[in-house]
């Protein structure tokens, strides 16, 4: 039994590692595989949080210098303040909507059927967006107008549906609003 749990944990860790940095929902994939493996309940949820911490640490490591420059430049650097304001504006819609709808989201949307549909629709959206992307107008987060950051945050609200990738929703929304690919991925 213990070996089965280790194999389940290794498989879920592999799934997280393969999907976290792609514009697909790593959480959605974990929900589906949790169900398939019977790895549910509080221990399964704690495990998901722990393996996702690795991805967060990786992002912090890769972007540490840039984030540190923003933090230390908040007082004197207008670009750092603008960057921080853009991030805050982009975060607000999902925070407010997520707090308001948390119970409904957990009760209705956290199931493999919803996740599967969201993953399929996300793939279709990526394919369609490739044909609709306008020429880029925005190349630096430090120069994002406030309304653009807020609109990107509204796109992020789509990721409140399990199976919709947060990075996928924000990258696609950013691209469709004229942000270049690299900047969209960084934001």
UniProtKB/Swiss-Prot annotation:
This is Undecaprenyl-diphosphatase. Belongs to the UppP family. Pfam families: BacA. Its EC number is 3.6.1.27. It is found in: Cell inner membrane. The chain crosses the membrane at residues 13-33, 45-65, 85-105, 108-128. It is an enzyme of class 3 (hydrolase). GO terms for cellular component: plasma membrane. Catalyzes the dephosphorylation of undecaprenyl diphosphate (UPP). Confers resistance to bacitracin. It catalyses: di-trans,octa-cis-undecaprenyl diphosphate + H2O = di-trans,octa-cis-undecaprenyl phosphate + phosphate + H(+). GO terms for molecular function: undecaprenyl-diphosphatase activity. The lineage of its organism: Bacteria, Pseudomonadati, Pseudomonadota, Alphaproteobacteria, Rhodospirillales. GO terms for biological process: cell wall organization; peptidoglycan biosynthetic process; regulation of cell shape; response to antibiotic. Keywords: Antibiotic resistance, Cell inner membrane, Cell membrane, Cell shape, Cell wall biogenesis/degradation, Hydrolase, Membrane, Peptidoglycan synthesis, Transmembrane, Transmembrane helix. It is a multi-pass membrane protein. Its main location: membrane. Bacitracin is thought to be involved in the inhibition of peptidoglycan synthesis by sequestering undecaprenyl diphosphate, thereby reducing the pool of lipid carrier available. It comes from Azospirillum brasilense.
